[in-house]
């Protein structure tokens, strides 16, 4: 139980003491319900109620989470392209494994959730993600390929980013290989075109953001679990990453 949550709960419950006594006497059950709702809201992750992040930046996360519950992996290859996966591990499952495969030839930054459960609390949205090593690596590369996952059981790959020409070319290559890819409009929530998005803080500001549905990510592995994904990549996984390798080699 985190001290910050305990303190918040105490303040909320204390505030109920100032409720007019007549109201409390007339509606005792209502007061009890309000107290229960307060407890629920404090101890339920904000993301599950409002689909918002628990932490607004990396400093907040670092100050509240055990260091063993997350990790950062980096690899420099001298390539102009950085493969970026800031929601790896158990946060957006499957993005770590794709990033690691592509890192055989390209630089990589990977932030991973390593909890046995509840990794969604480690999600910091791209426009707020400011882990120092991520900022440094992004700023040292010309281009960024940003890997993400979103909750949808249908198989879909949504491609966005600021590099519209290359993004459209990638969609064409993926479709030709039989993958369910679509090019997002600039105003789509998953387009990833905000200048505050860490993927757009490279030397050129050019990025491709790849959003993979849960259904598609599951199709890449024999067993879709945190511990098993790294050793159960299937033929479809390697077909997908091979398309990515060819695209990267021919485009940059």
UniProtKB/Swiss-Prot annotation:
GO terms for molecular function: hydrolase activity. It comes from the Bacteria. Gene3D superfamilies: Poly-gamma-glutamate hydrolase, zinc-binding motif (3.40.630.100). It is found in: Cell membrane. It is a single-pass membrane protein. GO terms for cellular component: plasma membrane. InterPro entries: Gamma_PGA_hydro (IPR008585), Gamma_PGA_hydro_sf (IPR038128). The keyword Protein transport does not apply. Keywords: Cell membrane, Membrane, Transmembrane, Transmembrane helix. The keyword Membrane applies. The chain crosses the membrane at residues 33-51. It holds the Pfam family Gamma_PGA_hydro. Belongs to the UPF0714 family. This is UPF0714 protein YndL. It comes from Bacillus subtilis (strain 168). The gene is yndL.
